[in-house]
Amino acid sequence: MAIHLYKTSTPSTRNGTVDSQVKSNPRNNLIYGQHRCGKGRNARGIITAGHRGGGHKRLYRKIDFRRTEKDIYGRIVTIEYDPNRNAYICLIHYGDGEKRYILHPRGALIGDTIVSGTEVPIKMGNALPLTDMPLGTAIHNIEITLGKGGQLARAAGAVAKLIAKEGKSATLKLPSGEVRLISKNCSATVGQVGNVGVNQKSLGRAGSKRWLGKRPVVRGVVMNPVDHPHGGGEGRAPIGRKKPTTPWGYPALGRRSRKRNKYSDNLILRRRSK
């Protein structure tokens, strides 16, 4: 990712950075309008996920997470920005005339060829079942359910590692540090997701954050008691509790958010690292 720095003509451009090489020019048959409802609210209009709202209108790009074009070579034509994810996407022209978007693998360049299937080379951007991959392979866009499409390791810079194969299952180490079992017949893409330096990008001003649909973050200790359990008091006051809590009074630190007795509990060999 080529980071472009602006001249310090204004305070907002003094600290802002932008990727000067990636632009967005999507194909009409691979995009469609999408109504972004909710903005962090549930069906009753109550905030359930804070700091969301507003943002620029977006067109959704149809991403081929399944890689259904089997044993047909495709060529990377463009590398584009996608407003719906922090990873870049690339347009693929296949030999049969089909055109698809896929996640951009790190290091892939315009003109490179990719393919998906059962007996394809272990090359960056190629998709194949886990049973055909050697141990230690770096992968992304991993299926959980056979034929459903990739669901794991899809964010910018995400990469998982194939560490074992035994019986009908393969053992993966995910980006979160979790170690879990997945069927060996599930497919994955070789390599790491691109745009690794996304966290090094500086927006430069608050308005750029609002374009992304993110609202300001306010500490509970500066609110009124009606708005947050930490609020109230004269001047700067402590939270008045033994432990920090959420706006609804639940423990804020250390509480597990995963549902109990989930079907996949027996597939997780080691919990994600904190």
Swiss-Prot record:
GO terms for biological process: mitochondrial translation. SMART domains: Ribosomal_L2 (SM01383), Ribosomal_L2_C (SM01382). Residues 7-25 have a biased composition (Polar residues). One of its GO terms (molecular function) is structural constituent of ribosome. Keywords: Chloroplast, Plastid, Ribonucleoprotein, Ribosomal protein. GO terms for cellular component: chloroplast; mitochondrial large ribosomal subunit. Its main location: plastid. It is found in: Plastid, Chloroplast. Belongs to the universal ribosomal protein uL2 family. HAMAP family: Ribosomal_uL2_B (MF_01320_B). This is Large ribosomal subunit protein uL2cz. It comes from Coffea arabica (Arabian coffee).
